[in-house]
Amino acid sequence: MKKLFTLMLLVLMVSIITFAQDQPQRPGPQPPPETGETFKVGMAGYTFAKFDLETALKTLQKTDVHYLCIKDFHLPMTSTDAEIAAFHAKLKEYDVTGYAVGPIYMKSEAEIDKAFEYAKRVGVKLIVGVPNYELLHYVDKKVKEYGFNYAIHLHGPDIAIYPDAEDVWEHVKDLDPRIGMCLDIGHDTRNGKDPVADLKKYQSRVFDIHIKDVTATTKLGYSLEVGRGVIDFPAFVRMLREVGYTGVCSLEHEKDMTDPFMGIAESIGYFRGVIAATK
C-alpha cells in the first residue's frame, strides 16, 4: 500500500510539472531601446535632491534605469567604509550601478583632496566636479595621481564659471586628457550654444552627459520635461552615435523637484522613444 501511494504521488508530481511546462509563458517587456547602443541611459542623483535613496532607487526601477550618478546627500563624503558597502548593497537590490560621484563643488585644494579620496573609497573612476579656475592645475595633478576621469559640470549663464562647453574646453585643452566635461545640454543651450555641435566638436573631452530640455536659448529659458523644449533630441541622439559616445546620458530633471515623478517618466520615455525612432 505504501509503495502504491508513493507511486501515485510521483505520477501526480510528474503530471503537475508537465502541465506547468505545457502552459504558455506570458511574454515580458522588450529591452530598453538603448540596448545595443554604445551609450547608456542613467539618472543624475540631483534629480532626487528632495528624496531619500530608497525613493530614488524605486523610481529608477520603475523606469528601467540602471545607472546613477551619486550625490553626496545620498552618500555623504564622510561615510565610513561600512556605510559605503551598505550603500552599494542597496543599489544592487535594485540592479543599479553607481557610475560616478558629483557634481561636487571644489573651492580649495583640501576640497579637491577630499573629493578624490571620496571617489576612491566609493569605487568609481569618474568625478563630476566644479573646481575654481585657479585650481585646475591642482586637479591635473590629482588626476595623474589617481588615474580618474574628471568631468567639469557646465552651468550655463547662472554662475560665473564654466557657462558652456566651449569655456570648459578652453580651460582644459592643455591639461591631462582625462580632464574633460559633463556636457549638460540644457545649460549649454541656455548659454546660446548648440549641444549637438558641441558634442561633435569636443567629443574627446565629453565624459558624462546630463540630459534635460529648456524653453529658450537664453538665460530666461528654464528646465522642463524632455521633448517640450527647444533642444533637437533626434539630432543629438544621432550625434551620440556618430561620435561613438560610450558614457552615460543621465537625466537631470530640475522641474517640480518636490514632485518630479511624472516628469521623470515622461522624459525618460521621450528620450528612449527618440533612440528607438532614429535607429
Where are these regions (language model features)?
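N-terminal pre-domain/capping segments
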Residues: 4, 19-126, 144, 268-279
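Bacterial N-terminal signal peptides
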Residues: 7-16
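Histidine-acidic metal/acid-base catalytic patches
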Residues: 21-45, 49-66, 165, 174-183, ...
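Active-site acidic/histidine proton-transfer and metal-coordination neighborhood
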Residues: 31, 54, 74, 94-181, ...
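Conserved residues at the C-terminal ends of beta-strands
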Residues: 71, 104, 130, 212, ...
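Short glycine-rich, flexible loops that bind phosphorylated cofactors or substrates
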Residues: 77, 136, 218
